[in-house]
Amino acid sequence: MDPLRIAVLLPHLGVYGGIRRFLELGAVWTRRGHDVLIATPRSATAREAWLPFAGRTGDVERVPEERWDVLLSPDPDLFRSVSVPGALRAFYAVLEKAPRARAAWSVADLVFGNSAGMVRHLRRRGVRAVAAPGGVNLERFHPPAADVRRARARAGGPVRALVYGRLSRRRKGSLTAARAVEAASRRSGVPVELTLFDAPPPGSRPAGEGEGMDLGIRIPHRWVLRPTQEELASLYGDADLFVSAERRAGWCNTAAEAMACGAAVVCTRSGTEDFARDGFTAHVSRWPWAWSLARRMTPLLRDPALRARVAEAGREKIGEFTWERTADLLERGIRERLEGREHAAKAS
């Protein structure tokens, strides 16, 4: 097959899970010999890729100067503002109820959804979306070589819980997750040590820095701010439990990464339906409320063997979701639409 020319339009290259997705995909496509450009506006606050990326980066404003097979973007405003004659316009929906997303769907040649939940959300609104679930970099995120979690459980020490601490975004549910950990510890009588981590955008001041923010919880807790990728993998690999209370997520990167590193996951259904099967690969709360999450967490605190079984099943399941697989699904959808357009042109 001929290489594809793919222009990815992003609002910035800052430290966000949604940006990770396209840096990972761009790296896969570049290794496969495709011509990939990740383009951001000249006015973007973060224009340096925060993950290693061997492909091209450049200006959104200059994208129309080249020939492209496809323009791919998750950002409704950028997607609508850029067009190139002959290029397929593919919108990648990554967030439920994203502002102005409906306007992007209406002009797209092709719409992808980044999870089963997102595809269902789109189809309820009359959009024929193609499923392209997210992935995990399994070379980076895996259990530590010397995994001490089972030995630590046998010794009877506190359970270590981990929460993504992006308090500035309420839909992430970070405060709800922290309160759920406290409630489950109190209900089960099992001591818990909680770690919250965040890599806030430039110019913002996260909770946990300076005077921080009072979480209103009375269990031991600490913040880890701006961890490197190696430090993040280490945090996941040290956690007995990872707790997520997200709402309106497309694909929950943090839950997937924690699962890949061998943590037992307690989560909502938001962004996790593809890999979190309740009672098997994770404990899933029906509602994004602290009491509901605490109820699903309590058995895992009380029973280390159950916690280990769920963690192992989760790690096996998430191993199916590589970025190479996601790249395959996107590439297949793009090629099928390009071929269909070519056949239609010949027939007319």
What spans do the regions from the language model cover?
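Donor nucleotide-sugar binding/catalytic pocket of nucleotide-sugar-dependent glycosyltransferases
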Residues: 109-144
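Conserved donor-binding/catalytic core segment of Leloir-type glycosyltransferases
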Residues: 152-172, 178-182
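Nucleotide-activated donor-binding/catalytic signature segment of Leloir-type glycosyltransferases, i.e.
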Residues: 207-230
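Short alpha-helical donor nucleotide-sugar binding micro-motif in glycosyltransferases
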Residues: 234-239
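Aromatic "clamp/platform" in nucleotide-sugar-dependent glycosyltransferases that forms part
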Residues: 247
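Short hydrophobic beta-strand element within catalytic cores of glycosyltransferases
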Residues: 264-267
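Conserved acidic donor-binding segment of nucleotide-sugar-dependent glycosyltransferases
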Residues: 278-290, 299-304
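A short, well-ordered alpha-helix in the C-terminal region of glycosyltransferases
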Residues: 299, 306-320, 332
